[in-house]
Structures are given as structure tokens and as C-alpha cells.
């Protein structure tokens, strides 16, 4: 029996815009509905694939090709996938759109100033002190999606509200069935 193709959702935005937080929240909301989903978080994948990343153009091209390939393997075998990755160049996300049958892109919108204030990994500080030279939003341009399936504003809306918007959009796209989202449970998941 051939498994049903899973969906792929790409959360894109500047570093520290809230992609991983929202990815975890969406996973929690979907698991409450017995919908399995795998998070492919670029930070975690980098620890395995490029433990000492250079963030060069060549390395990023390779990394996002591998990330899309992993996503394709998962979705072709029925798994649902959420990518939480800046992927600052549109071509990275376009490659995923071309390779994955049921694909949607969510733009996690947040000002550079707010992202810098949220930065727990010190990415922006490294850029400002010259320790990093290719940080999206500062030294390299971030290319926002021209027509995302959804834009969520993590500066104006809570993580819970953004998760609700994303789950609603997954329903509208018919990636998942319609069901009421339990916001209390989302808050629990995001708090852990």
C-alpha cells in the first residue's frame, strides 16, 4: 500500500523571529488532534550536518538542498513536516516548493529590532562585533516570500495566536481536517 503523501510547511523569517517556537506550538496543536508531524529545525540539523558551520553561500546551498531532500523522503512516506529555517534566499524555499507536493510557506514577520532583542544565541551580537559576516537581516539580505500561504506577525500577536492562525491555514489548505484548536493546550506546550 502506498502511503498518503504528507504535507510540508516552511516557517521562514529572520533569525529569532519565532520560527522554532511556532513550529513546536503547531506540532503540539496537531498532536492533540492525533496528527503526527516532524519538526526539521535548521539549528538542530546544523548540529549534525555542519557542527562547525561557516555559513558560506556554498555551505548554505548544500545545507538547504539536504534539508529539502530529508523533507521529501519524509513526506513521500506519509510523514508531515514542519521546516523551521530562515532560508534567507527565496531559491531555497522555491526548491522545496518544487520538490514537495503538498507545500505551504508561512512568513514569520518580525522587525529586525525585535529579533535582535530576542536573540538568545547571540547571532546578531556576533555580527555587530565582526565575529560573523553573513547574518540575514544585517550583512546579507533576507528575501521575504512574495506570496506566502500565510504571514504571522510575532511582534504584534502572541505565539498562541500565531499557532492558531497557522493551524487554521492548514485546515483551509485541506492539509488537515477542521477541528477546534485547544488554546489552553497550546499554551502548555509552548510553556514547556
Would you name each region that the model predicts?
Residues 11:
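Hydrophobic anchor at the beta1->P-loop junction of P-loop NTPases
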Residues 58-104, 108, 124-127:
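Glycine-rich phosphate-binding loop used to anchor ATP phosphates in small-molecule kinases
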Residues 24-72, 76:
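Conserved substrate/cofactor phosphate-moiety recognition/catalytic segment
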Residues 15:
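The conserved Walker
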Residues 117-165, 173-190:
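Small-molecule kinase domains that catalyze NTP-dependent phosphoryl transfer to phosphate-bearing small molecules
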Residues 19:
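Conserved lysine of the Walker
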